[in-house]
Design a protein with these regions (language model features):
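Active-site entrance/lid segments in N-terminal catalytic domains of soluble metabolic enzymes
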Residues: 160-401, 405, 579-581, 602-623, ...
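Flexible glycine/proline-rich, aromatic-decorated loop/lid segments
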Residues: 5-34, 41, 295, 300-303, ...
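Glycine-rich beta-to-alpha transition loops that act as phosphate-gripper elements at the mouths
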Residues: 1, 233, 346-351, 410-424
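Catalytic alpha/beta core domains of metabolic enzymes, predominantly
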Residues: 27-56, 64, 385-387, 400-409, ...
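Long, distal/terminal scaffolding or interaction modules
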Residues: 471-472, 483, 497-500, 509-512, ...
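Catalytic cores of alpha/beta
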Residues: 1-10, 351-363, 421-434
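Anionic ligand-binding catalytic core segments
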Residues: 472, 476-488
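Flexible, glycine-rich loop/tail regions that form catalytic "lids" or insertion modules at the edges
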Residues: 3, 7, 13-15, 28-263, ...
Length: 672
């Protein structure tokens, strides 16, 4: 991290002389079994690997491009300090000045030499709770109280939990500094619990990263309350698409499409109420999901269309998204495959996320997720947990303001996640602009997670995040516990809405004028924080919450004509041949046709060679996308980019025009 910061601020070379001196001392004392030259080489290699990781997160390939780019945001530094010493680095909430930096430096120096160190430095609990260490929002007391409340079904106990969270001794999150205005009305006038629970979703945790039992418990609970669970980026077993005999459903309503595209088939997509394109996640922005090989058993490999025992690592970028136009095309493709599903895009809270969100709205996403840095840290790299991403309050407020400023807010829903736990959290996030709310860590804790931070090691002692059969038998979570949790949350939201004086959650969305700063005593440092930029309200007459649906323009695509002509093949599996001319304005040709077939016949599709379609001309982007078995496309001409994207068993042939005299090796007839 130190090297990344120095290079990012413009350094051309680094000399970590103290690190080299320490290595020299360790070699001399024979505490490491290497000669100095080898030890130094390995240290430099480790630093370089860390730099490569950071650069790849930002999509930067060369050190020349990274040097001086200042792709950072300051949190807690004053603008005065930032402008004077960091070249005007963005600092949204202000904070400490040079005086405070000097006092801290002296205090740390004095503490460092105050007493003799006995060899081992103390564990301050930066990543996991320690009794006298760093304060954590999830600690033994909050975890045990929440688990007890949801197991007993006790709302009184749940209020003890929220009192611990909302009344903590010192602020941990930005929202801990905030409160809201009150003008109470009768709670009988407030919308019911059931209506509020529709806004709740669980986080994108894949089957593989967590156990089958935990994944299915979340799906059952969310379907029961008419919320939505998320598959994560690991696909979903098709056996879960059909409700069980007792009426419960294991199907996750949200199907995620991540950069690795694990398990993404046409059948998978048509069994979704929402399809989520994961651009980034709050806990480790710029990194793809990473499932170690020892967690990939036969069933997980089958679900992800992979091989057992092989580590499954999603690349940082989607290889078909390098611009907003590319994203718009993927949204169009997915909407064609499943016209019923909403298409969402998951972004990380970061400096500049508002501009990105505006582009996503113009790309016709139905929903935008702003993922905060505080959540989803179970299996994330230590450096990402502490130093990547920013608070959801910062990302959400910037997104809300930018969308309203550009007149785009009305056509998209906004969802937020990042350590949401209580009704107060939900109400404050709604006032900052969110309409839906994601819960991941809290949902796992309700199911039994004790925050051991062993998610990536396959050794979770309570069977939540492991594929070890012996450990999975220790899983005692039940979907009923999650139903209790979300019911209690919604009830607490109702109580807060009554205190504020509104009847519906919709009435406070984007209403930052209702937010006030807590009047409690603050430390001198905390008093320097300013929330003016976060709470600024754009007053241009534009919508401040979702009011209209996106127009995706899929009513007149080529597939509508093909579906009508191929009705006999779809209904009776009768072999049919069709022929069409095609132009480059005909995009995602075959996607809607394939989605219709997959919805009816599943992964098997149609019998071989049932539907044979010949095209002549220049096909648009995503020709033959998600084509299913039994469908053969033959194109005489050329095709634009994304030919055969997500191919799911269909066949595509692209041939040059019959009378062309082009030299094949010198010409291209299909994009990448």
């Amino acid at each position: 991290m130190h090297a990344a910061l120095l290079l990012g601020f413009g350094a051309s070379a680094l000399n970590p002389y103290m690190a080299f001196a320490v290595i020299d001392k360790l070699v001399a004392k024979e505490e490491i079994q290497l000669d100095y030259a080898t030890a130094e080489k390995k240290y430099i290699k480790a630093i370089c690997k860390g730099l490569f990781k950071i650069m790849s997160k930002m999509g930067i390939s060369t050190i020349r491009s990274y040097r001086g780019a200042k792709i950072f945001e300051a949190v807690g530094l004053s603008e005065e300090l930032s402008n004077a010493y960091f070249g005007g680095l963005r600092s949204t909430i202000g904070g400490i000045r040079l005086d405070e930096v000097a006092r801290d430096a002296i205090a740390f120096h004095d503490a460092g030499f105050a007493a003799q160190v006995d060899g081992l430095l103390p564990n301050n609990g930066l990543y996991a709770f320690r009794k006298d260490g760093e304060k954590h929002a999830w600690n033994p007391e909050t975890i045990s109280t929440l688990q007890l409340a949801t197991r007993l079904g006790s709302y009184k106990k749940f209020k003890e939990f929220t009192s611990l969270v909302d009344g903590k001794e010192a602020p941990i999150f930005l929202r801990d500094f905030l409160d809201f205005r009150r003008a109470p009305i009768s709670i009988d006038k407030v919308e019911p619990v059931e209506s509020i629970m529709h806004r709740f979703v669980t986080g994108a945790m894949s089957y593989g990263s967590i156990s089958k039992e935990a994944h299915e418990a979340m799906a059952i609970a969310m379907n029961r309350i008419h919320g939505r669970s998320n598959t994560g980026e690991g696909g979903e077993d098709s056996a879960r698409f059909t409700p069980r005999e007792d009426g419960t459903s294991l199907r996750s309503a949200i199907k995620q499409v991540a950069s690795g595209r694990f398990g993404v088939t046409t059948e998978y997509l048509v069994n979704a109420d929402e399809i989520q394109i994961k651009v980034a996640q709050g806990a480790k922005p710029g990194e793809g999901g990473q499932l170690p090989g020892f967690k990939v058993d036969q069933v997980i490999a089958k679900t992800r269309h992979s091989i057992p025992g092989i580590s499954l690592i999603s690349p940082p970028p989607h290889h078909d998204i390098y611009s907003i136009e590319d994203l718009a095309q993927l949204i169009f493709d997915l909407k064609n495959v499943n016209p019923r599903a909403k298409i969402s895009v998951k972004l990380v809270a970061e400096s500049g996320v508002g501009t990105i969100a505006a582009g996503v709205a113009k790309a016709k996403a139905d929903l935008i997720v702003i993922s905060g840095a505080e959540g989803g840290t179970g299996a994330s790299p230590a450096s990402s947990i502490r130093y990547a991403g920013i608070s959801p309050e910062l990302g959400l407020s910037e997104t809300q303001q930018t969308l309203v400023l550009n007149g785009l807010r009305g056509q998209v829903m906004l969802q937020v996640d990042g350590q949401l736990k209580t009704g107060r959290d939900i109400v404050l996030m709604a006032m900052l602009g969110a309409e839906e709310f994601g819960f991941a860590t809290s949902a796992l804790i309700v199911l039994g997670c004790v925050m051991m931070r062993k998610c990536h090691q396959n050794t979770c002692p309570v069977g939540v995040a492991t594929q070890n059969e012996e450990l999975r038998r220790r899983f005692h979570g039940r979907s009923e516990y999650l139903v209790n949790f979300f019911t209690f949350l919604a009830q607490e939201v109702r109580e807060y809405l009554a205190e504020i004086g509104v009847e519906r959650l919709d009435d406070i969305i984007g209403r930052t004028d209702l937010i006030i700063r807590k009047p409690e005593n603050e430390s001198p440092k905390q008093s320097l924080i300013s929330f003016d930029k976060i709470l600024a309200r754009v007053d241009n007459g534009a919508a401040i919450r979702h009011t209209i649906d996106q127009q995706h323009g899929i009513d007149h695509v080529k597939d509508v004509e093909m579906l009508h002509a191929a009705a006999e093949a779809l209904e009776n599996q009768k072999e049919i041949s069709l022929e069409y001319t095609i132009a480059n304005t005909d995009r995602a040709c075959g996607a809607m046709l394939s989605g219709t077939i997959a919805a009816k016949y599943g992964e098997a599709g149609l019998p071989e060679h049932t539907l044979n379609v010949k095209f002549k001309g220049s096909a648009g982007q995503s020709f033959g996308a998600f084509l299913v078995p039994g469908v053969n496309f033959k194109l005489e001409g050329e095709a634009n980019d994304y030919l055969g994207k997500g191919l799911s068993g269909g066949r595509i042939a692209v041939l040059p025009p019959v009378r062309s005299n082009f030299q094949a090796e010198k010409n291209t007839i299909a994009g990448n």
